[in-house]
């Protein structure tokens, strides 16, 4: 079992990565003893893992569950209220703990519910998708979507522990696994050139779910994110680099309707647009764009935006992006493999050229 620490002073917490961790009561015991436990999961994950985690936690306290519909389109205030209603109807107090058992949608909603309920109760992340294991479960970003924008209603709220059981990936649909790889590849582009090269060399091992390769890839992503979050918890500086591909990607998700494009698929296409923007600005050359595209394609990810999206569609959503400051769209762009920066002087004419030529 691999352990990584997210250093945030009194809000520090561990990430555990390994196999069969959902049956490891010893690791969870210190976070659950004498607490009432409410597990939040969805209709897809519940038949696979809910009974197992309930049995693991039953010796520590009273365990109940809430099962939500599965999909990004249900990450909204209405379904957040379902969690609040369960907590209130069953008289959960401040000594309770919420457990997020699922992917990024469940993790984001459960964390936001924990941040809000009685002004804050403990929560635990048990991510079951690759995307949530390498990205959304770490760092304390919690939110729900609004019809006008993704993750617009939320809070920074850190979990007590992140428990990553890599065996969950064996029940993950291939499309979901590929979507997670978009976030994995992002770390190589924006932070670690050696990791990017390792990914290029280990495509087959990862696609065949080689245990050693999975643990290494997930661990390296979590190490990078833990490092970044420890430096900049609330995204005032370096943490913004983790949004590589996301400004374009969030526009795709919002325009196409949440759930039609998976988050990772939109990030993949958005990462290519970011790379093409960087090339248009003279920050990188064509060879780097090609390496990025080839690696994304190796994992069966989309490398272009939907044909139905034009420049006006993109710019409307990008102007609402959370990184906008003083009315200026700010983009995270690669400056090399392994490096990225935030740029606020990208003109709309440059963006139009990139989007129209993509």
Swiss-Prot record:
A Pfam entry, by short name: DHQS_C
Residues annotated for Zn(2+) binding in this entry: 183, 246, 263
GO biological process: one example: aromatic amino acid family biosynthetic process
GO annotation, cellular component aspect: cytoplasm
GO MF annotation terms: 3-dehydroquinate synthase activity; metal ion binding; nucleotide binding
The record's free-text note on cofactor binding: Binds 1 divalent metal cation per subunit. Can use either Co(2+) or Zn(2+).
Catalytic activity: 7-phospho-2-dehydro-3-deoxy-D-arabino-heptonate = 3-dehydroquinate + phosphate
Subcellular localization(s) per the UniProt record: Cytoplasm
EC number: 4.2.3.4
Xref: InterPro entries: Dehydroquinate_synthase, DHQ_synth_AroB, DHQ_synth_fam, DHQS/DOIS_N, DHQS_C
Binding site for NAD(+): 70-75, 104-108, 128-129, 141, 150, 168-171
Cofactor: Co(2+); Zn(2+); NAD(+)
HAMAP family: DHQ_synthase (MF_00110)
Function per UniProt: Catalyzes the conversion of 3-deoxy-D-arabino-heptulosonate 7-phosphate (DAHP) to dehydroquinate (DHQ).
UniProt record similarity statement: Belongs to the sugar phosphate cyclases superfamily. Dehydroquinate synthase family.
Protein name listed in UniProt: 3-dehydroquinate synthase
Taxonomic classification: Bacteria, Pseudomonadati, Pseudomonadota, Gammaproteobacteria, Alteromonadales
């Amino acid at each position: 079992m691999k352990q990584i620490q997210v250093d945030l002073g009194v809000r520090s917490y561990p990430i555990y990565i390994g196999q069969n961790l959902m049956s490891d009561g010893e690791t969870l015991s210190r976070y659950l003893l004498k607490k009432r436990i409410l597990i939040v999961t969805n209709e897809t994950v519940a038949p696979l893992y809910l009974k197992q985690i309930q049995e693991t936690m039953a010796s520590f306290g009273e365990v109940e569950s809430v099962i939500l519909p599965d999909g990004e389109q249900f990450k909204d205030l209405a379904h957040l209220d379902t969690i609040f209603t369960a907590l209130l109807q069953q008289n959960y107090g401040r000594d309770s703990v919420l457990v997020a058992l699922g992917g990024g949608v469940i993790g984001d909603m459960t964390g936001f519910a924990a941040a809000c309920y009685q002004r804050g109760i403990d929560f635990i992340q048990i991510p079951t998708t690759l995307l949530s294991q390498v990205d959304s479960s770490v760092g304390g970003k919690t939110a729900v979507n609004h019809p006008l924008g993704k993750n617009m209603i939320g809070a920074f709220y850190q979990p007590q522990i992140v428990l990553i059981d890599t065996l969950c990936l064996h029940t993950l649909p291939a499309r979901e696994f590929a979507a997670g790889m978009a976030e994995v590849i992002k770390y190589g582009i924006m932070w670690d050139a050696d990791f990017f090269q390792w990914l290029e060399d280990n495509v087959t091992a990862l696609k065949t779910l080689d245990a050693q390769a999975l643990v290494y890839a997930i661990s390296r992503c979590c190490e990078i994110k833990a490092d970044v979050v420890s430096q900049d918890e609330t995204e005032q500086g370096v943490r913004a680099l983790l949004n590589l591909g996301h400004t374009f990607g969030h526009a795709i998700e919002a325009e196409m309707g949440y759930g039609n494009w998976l988050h990772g698929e939109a990030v993949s296409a958005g990462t290519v647009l970011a790379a093409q923007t960087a090339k248009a600005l003279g920050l990188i050359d064509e060879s780097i764009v090609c390496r990025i595209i080839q690696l994304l394609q190796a994992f069966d990810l989309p490398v272009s935006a939907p044909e139905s999206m034009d420049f006006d569609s993109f710019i409307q959503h990008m102007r609402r992006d959370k990184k906008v400051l003083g009315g200026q769209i700010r983009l995270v762009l690669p400056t090399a493999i392994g490096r990225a920066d935030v740029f606020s002087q990208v003109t709309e004419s440059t963006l139009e050229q990139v989007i129209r030529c993509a």
